[in-house]
Amino acid sequence: MGRIIDTDGKPFSFDPEMQSAALDIPQIASRYIEHPASGITPNRAAQCLRGAERGDLIAQSDLAADIEEKDTHLFAELGKRRLAIQGVPWSIEPPPNASANEKKDAEMLDEYLHSADWFDAMLFDATDAILKGYSCMEIEHGMLGKMHIIRAIRWRDSGHFCLNPDDLSELRLRDGSHSGVAFQPFGWIVHQSRSRTGYGGATGLVRTLIWPFIFKNYSVRDLAEFLEVYGLPMKVGKYPSGATPEQKSALMRAVMDIGRRTGGIIPAGMSLEFQAAANGQADPFETMISWGERSISKAILGGTLTTEAGDKGARSLGEVHNEVRREI
C-alpha cells in the first residue's frame, strides 16, 4: 500500500482497522438506549441539556432520538429537511490551476462516489446532526485490486461519543475514560451541524424543539383525559331499595361492561340509563397542540405554510415559506 499524506504533504501512519472494534469500545457501544422522553418534565429536560453542555452527550442524544420517534409532526418536518439534501446536485472539482494528474484524480473520484452504493445513505445519516448537533460515521476500508477504497460507511449511535473536557468543541469516541479517545485519521466522517452558536453539545435543534414538544404533549395528554370524561355518555344504574350487595355488584359489572359491548344483562327490578355527555370545550387543548406544532415547524423549516395552509394561507405566502425551507 502506498503512503498516505496529509494536506501538508507529510506522511502519517494509517490503521485500516475500524477503531470502534478496538480496546474497550465494543463494551461501550453495547449500551441500551434510554427513552428519557417518557414522562418528560421541564426539569428533567433541563438536566439532559445541562449534561450535554458539560460534555456528557448521552442523555441529550437519547432525548433527541426519542422525540423524533414519538412526535409524528416533528418526524415529518425533520424528514423534509433531511431528505431535501438528496436532491442537491454535486460534483468533485479539481482545484484552481490544477495539473493534469489532479484533474484526472478529481474525475476518478467523481465517478467513484457517484457509483458508490453507500453514498446516498451516508448523506442521509449525516443529516442526523440537524437534530442532535453531530453525526459520526465510521469508514470501513477495503481493497479493489491495487486501489484502496471505502467499502462501506457505518453510522454510529450518537451516544457513543463525548466531548473533550479540555476543548468542548472537539468530539471524541467514548472508551470508558474521562476524556475519551481522539478519532483516528481517515477513520471517520464527522458532520457537525450548527442550528445555533455554541460548543459541541449545544448546537443541535433538540435544544429548541424539546420545549414545544413537552408543552404540546401535556395538552395531548389533557385532551385524551378530557375526551374520556366529556366524550362519552354517563351510564347510571339504579337498584331498588333493599338490594343486596351481590345485586349491587352485579349491576355495577353490567354498567361497566356495557360501555365496552353493545349489550348486557342486569338483575330484574334494576334499570340502566344513559345520560347526555357533560358539556365541555376541547378548544384550549387544540390551541396549545397547534401552537406546539407551529413552533416545531418554524424551528425546523423556518415557517409553517409548507405544512398547512392556515386561515390565510395564500399560495404566494406558501411559496415564500418554501423558499425559506429550501435555503435552510
Which residue ranges define each predicted feature?
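Intrinsically disordered or highly flexible coil/loop and linker segments, enriched in small
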Residues: 88, 118, 225, 229-232, ...
